[in-house]
From Swiss-Prot:
One of its GO terms (biological process) is translation. PANTHER family: LARGE RIBOSOMAL SUBUNIT PROTEIN BL34M (PTHR14503:SF4), MITOCHONDRIAL RIBOSOMAL PROTEIN 34 FAMILY MEMBER (PTHR14503). This is Large ribosomal subunit protein bL34. The lineage of its organism: Bacteria, Bacillati, Actinomycetota, Actinomycetes, Kitasatosporales. Belongs to the bacterial ribosomal protein bL34 family. NCBIfam families: rpmH_bact. Keywords: Ribonucleoprotein, Ribosomal protein. Pfam families: Ribosomal_L34 (PF00468). Gene3D superfamilies: 1.10.287.3980.
Length: 45
């Protein structure tokens, strides 16, 4: 039997999808801008 692929880990989650990571690149900032304009309650992890 294969293991479950999702092994929750908050630190890894933030490091991969976090706000500061999004702010680091131009593309990431574009993602945030899109989510802001859409009115998302959560911008990032």
């Amino acid at each position: 039997m294969s293991k479950r692929t999702f092994q929750p880990n908050n630190r890894r989650r933030a490091k991969t999808h976090g706000f500061r990571l999004r702010m680091r690149t131009r593309a990431g900032r574009a993602i945030l801008a899109t989510r802001r304009s859409k009115g998302r309650a959560r911008l990032s992890a």
